[in-house]
Amino acid sequence: MAVSPLFPLQHKTALVTGATSGIGLVTARELARQGARVILVGRNPDKAAQARAAILAAVPDAVLDVRLFDLALLSNVRHMAAEIQGDYSQLDILVNNAGIMPGPLTVTAEGHELSWATNHLSVFALTNLL
């Protein structure tokens, strides 16, 4: 007997950042399993292709869209948000999962500390822009 989900996800669109591994990959896979169209966001093309293949192996009828963006730069976040808004009439679910571990002090081209830019500024900006 199949269990009916509390919130049906068929015909819903979900965007998952950091979707190429770990929690993000599992989240994207399970959203797809529940029938959502999933936009996978990652920064590494090889890992993104592997993530897409892994999800399709588990959920052959998954509807996936892979986007490559490095969220450490707010200019990339703005570009991605505009692209998503142009391509989709509605975004139902946003999973801000992308993050990095702090390492040696690294400053982005926009002048922000790398982990602060990725883990905090991009989340705030993406949520507000979408």
Each model region followed by its residue ranges:
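N-terminal Rossmann-fold cofactor-binding loop
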Residues: 18-19, 41-46, 71
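Short alpha-helical oligomerization interface
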Residues: 102-118
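The beta1-alpha1 cofactor-binding region of Rossmann-like NAD(H)/NADP(H)-dependent oxidoreductases
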Residues: 45, 66-82
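N-terminal Rossmann-like NAD(P) cofactor-binding module of classical short-chain dehydrogenase/reductase
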Residues: 15-16, 92-95, 99, 116
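A glycine-rich helix->loop->beta "capping" turn
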Residues: 59-63, 83-96, 102-107
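A short, exposed helix-loop element centered on a Lys and neighboring polar residues
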Residues: 127-128
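Canonical Rossmann dinucleotide-binding motif of NAD(H)/NADP(H)-dependent dehydrogenases/reductases
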Residues: 2-40
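Glycine-rich NAD(P)-binding loop of the Rossmann-fold in SDR/ketoreductase-type enzymes
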Residues: 43, 72, 114-122
